[in-house]
């Protein structure tokens, strides 16, 4: 029996059998190096004066899953909290390192912005927010996002260049006052 206990873990490693924690979104490849990189970029972003983080949901709720809560949780190396109201599923998810890296590059290239949602809030049922792959912004370069803001189109174009495959803003349904950028699953 003792030999079986010793052999099973070795067998699991050799055959590639893995275990997924309940906090995983199932699609992420959260190796140690990607978690370290995401933690480092989240810390950098949390401390960057060019980015502000909404401390509550746009709906007004304080549920521990605001953009500010999410960036603090990610910078501490943790999975971040998702809201559990409306269509939000609750639970936790790790933020995607590609998205965090893109946000960092946007700052380094001179954009200032306010993040209103990452994994929290209530979105469409299949929203990539719930997978830690999307963020919303309502101010860019000191101006409210809207048709008259001259910066939002360039901001979203740069997000696409940095890997976002879903970008929404003024002119798209339910996005007249904010931008949405999401990375692939």
Regions found by a protein language model. Give the residues of each.
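Short, compositionally biased low-complexity segments
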Residues: 68-80
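Catalytic cores and adjacent binding grooves of peptidoglycan-active enzymes
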Residues: 31-43, 48, 52, 56-71, ...
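Positively charged n-region of N-terminal signal peptides that target proteins for export
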Residues: 1-4
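Active-site-adjacent loop/helix surface patches within enzyme catalytic domains
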Residues: 100-129
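Bacterial lipoprotein signal-peptidase II cleavage site
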Residues: 24-28
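Helical scaffold of the NTase/Pol beta-like nucleotidyltransferase catalytic core
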Residues: 77-109
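Bacterial N-terminal signal peptides
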Residues: 7-16
């Amino acid at each position: 029996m003792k030999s079986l206990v010793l052999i099973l873990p070795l067998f699991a490693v050799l055959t590639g059998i893995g275990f997924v924690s309940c906090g995983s979104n199932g699609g992420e490849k959260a190796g140690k190096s990607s978690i370290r990189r995401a933690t480092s970029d989240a810390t950098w972003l949390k401390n960057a004066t060019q980015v502000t983080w909404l401390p509550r949901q746009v709906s007004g709720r304080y549920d521990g899953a605001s953009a500010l809560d999410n960036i603090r949780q990610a910078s501490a190396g943790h999975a971040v909290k998702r809201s559990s109201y409306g269509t939000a599923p609750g639970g936790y998810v790790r933020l995607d390192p590609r998205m965090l890296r893109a946000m960092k590059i946007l700052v380094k290239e001179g954009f200032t912005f306010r993040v209103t949602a990452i994994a929290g809030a209530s979105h469409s049922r299949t929203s990539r927010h719930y997978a830690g792959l999307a963020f919303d912004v309502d101010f860019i370069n000191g101006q409210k996002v809207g048709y008259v803001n001259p910066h939002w189109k360039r901001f979203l174009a740069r997000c696409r260049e940095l890997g976002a495959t879903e970008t929404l803003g003024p002119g798209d349904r339910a996005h007249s006052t904010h931008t949405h950028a999401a990375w692939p699953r």
